[in-house]
Amino acid sequence: MKLIASNKKAYFDYEILETLEAGLALLGSEVKALRQTRVNLKDNFVKIIKGEAFLFGVHISYLDTIHAYYKPNERRERKLLLHKKQLLKWQIEASKERLSIVGLKLYFNQRNRAKIQIALVKGKRLHDKRQSLKEKALNKEILADLKHHFKG
């Protein structure tokens, strides 16, 4: 698995309930751009429209070597390739419990197919975000103390 991009902000802003791997329907120039890691997953989300899942907000920059007459839309919606059962299950859960679906990681699998790890998430409140920052700082401090203790 070759990691292309990850959405670190999603781990901070959301509580991740369940994850799933989905394929992406891409153009050839977009796959080439992914191989050069010219992608940004920062503010992406998934919408289910007429029984199909689409990924919005992913910015895939086109290559510099592309023809002048061919300028693809860098922020176009991209279709996700999922099984119908998984899609229906997540659609019901998301609508019933007011949950969202976001992309976490974009990568190439062993067969060199572009895949995205999507997650069913629940938004964190401000105090939850503060709590996670405190825990992160505390863990960092503990690791530094342990390192200093064993170093001598």
UniProtKB/Swiss-Prot annotation:
Q: Which GO terms describe its cellular component?
A: cytosol
The protein's GO terms of the molecular function aspect are: RNA binding
Function according to Swiss-Prot or TrEMBL: Required for rescue of stalled ribosomes mediated by trans-translation. Binds to transfer-messenger RNA (tmRNA), required for stable association of tmRNA with ribosomes. tmRNA and SmpB together mimic tRNA shape, replacing the anticodon stem-loop with SmpB. tmRNA is encoded by the ssrA gene; the 2 termini fold to resemble tRNA(Ala) and it encodes a 'tag peptide', a short internal open reading frame. During trans-translation Ala-aminoacylated tmRNA acts like a tRNA, entering the A-site of stalled ribosomes, displacing the stalled mRNA.
What turns on this gene? By growth at pH 5.0 in exponential phase.
Protein localization: Cytoplasm
For the keyword Cytoplasm, the answer is yes
State the InterPro entries in the record. Answer: SmpB, SsrA-bd_prot, SsrA-bd_prot_CS
Chief subcellular location: cytoplasm
GO biological process terms held by the UniProt record: trans-translation
Stored PROSITE patterns = SSRP
Which keywords does this Swiss-Prot/TrEMBL entry list?
Answer: Cytoplasm, RNA-binding, Stress response
- Recorded family membership: Belongs to the SmpB family.
Q: What is this protein called?
A: SsrA-binding protein
What does a knockout show? Answer: Essential, it cannot be deleted. Depletion experiments show loss of growth after 12 hours, cells remain viable for a further 12 hours before they can no longer be rescued by induction of smpB. Similarly, the gene for tmRNA (ssrA) cannot be deleted; mutations in the tmRNA show that it is the ribosome rescue function and not protein tagging and subsequent degradation that is essential for viability. Mutant tmRNAs that affect protein tagging are however more susceptible to antibiotic stress and less naturally competent for DNA transformation.
Q: Which organism is it from?
A: Helicobacter pylori (strain ATCC 700392 / 26695)
